[in-house]
Amino acid sequence: MTGEDVAGAAPGAPAGDCFATPDPGDPALSPTGRVQRPVVLMVLDGWGCAPAGPGNAVSLARTPVFDRLVAEHPHGTLEASGPAVGLPPGQMGNSEVGHLNIGAGRVVHQDLTRISKAIADGDFFRNRVLVQACAKAAGRGRTLHLMGLVSGGGVHSDMGHLKACLELAAREKVSSVVVHAFLDGRDTRPRSAKGYLAEIQQTMDELGVGRFGVISGRYYAMDRDTRWDRVKLAYDALVYGRGFFAADAQAAVDAAYKRGESDEFVRPTVVAAELDARVADGDVCLFFNFRPDRARELTRAFAEPGFAGFDRGSHPPAVDFVTMTSYKKELGLPVAFPPEHPINVLADVLAAHGLRQLHVAETEKYAHVTFFFNGGVEAPFAGETRILVPSPRDVPTYDHKPAMSAFGVTDELLAALAGGDFAFAVVNYANADMVGHTGVISAAVAALEAVDECLGRVVELVTRLGGVCLVTADHGNADHMLEPDGSPNTAHSTNLVPFIATAEGARVREGGRLCDLAPTALALLGLVQPPEMTGADLLEPSP
């Protein structure tokens, strides 16, 4: 466990008034008519609402605590996908989007939508960073490498964005373009890559530009937990041409399937071609993923001065590296679509009132309760304590350890709440999402039951402290683990997510969205939400 406690209060904030009771006539009071602290927001990642069935691990699991909370407390459902979280209609939500909307208290229009709009109105093809990247490759007679997730999942990348990159390269007369395709199988069906690769091949044929270089499962190319041994395999394929070999992209996938590998786990494979597709000195690389967390490590391997994650060999290539969005500010790389940070997010408001706040998660979801929850701000706010609990590293996938680090997360959360004067806490339980992605229903059931046990411990302490738990999820996953044909579904769902408030004298209004959680927390804390927050309190007085 690592902790980071940043003390401080807004100018003029009285010391030690975290638990002061405001004037009863204050319109900021919660529907219960009293301030309740601490408010603990529990995000049960990947726990959606769906009819019971053989593919719904949520309904299959024994969750007596969750069931009791639903029976005894105000509850309802929230929208967590599509326009309700700033995504296109029908697009499933994800952890980044979910936590951003939760913490911001408003619908935050996502990079997926923003980039797609730029393509539609033509601004994409005038983007200075992208045009300059193409100009460098064309002017030097070097290769433009387009790397990223080739997937229709819409969680980390978008097929239309890659096609637009290829079109831009053709317009800018880049003669050598290589697509390094990372395969999905988590946010798409486990063996769906061949269709996506064929779609991109058709685009390359129509434009007369581009060829495939390396085919790799995201397990290797898109790790986010510093498992550098995995990333090294992808890097070595890209730079040194090491790994499996195949005549073309389709053959690479066929061979992987014969080895028993689904898309996510395809070992890095070099597509044999007449021209060398390796990344070399003077080349230009564009990572086209719009979501940063799983693009960051491979980017660091190419662009971080003094990189020490693994041995990159005697001569790592000196390249111009460009990213679609900002993956890591400290790298100082050109970014095609810089971040647009919402202001006056929940963490900011709490800091401005001199209130202490606690953010807890295991490694897999740590960025979500910090960076994303705080509106894309990396540094902690005043009075913010962060606790990171390491995710298990002794298993290849979490179906082998479905409890993950949930019990450790709970231990740290309870110890901090019992020993500190926190007004607010947010905690993420990663299990339903991370184990749901494995497609192993029995493991997902065990994961949910572990979270339910932790839920009971947290609610018990918070109730004893006089506080309120807000129980919800950022998106669905474990609620939809089978396709209609009986094959595994490892992607997120577009189902509604639960919302439970352990508050008395209130009921949950209908039509809620994730962006309504921050205003709800502020109301329970007796604070007025800022005008930038356009969400609304989910609780209203009982009749």
Model-predicted segments: where are they?
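Feature captures the catalytic ectodomains and active-site-proximal regions of enzymes
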Residues: 2-543
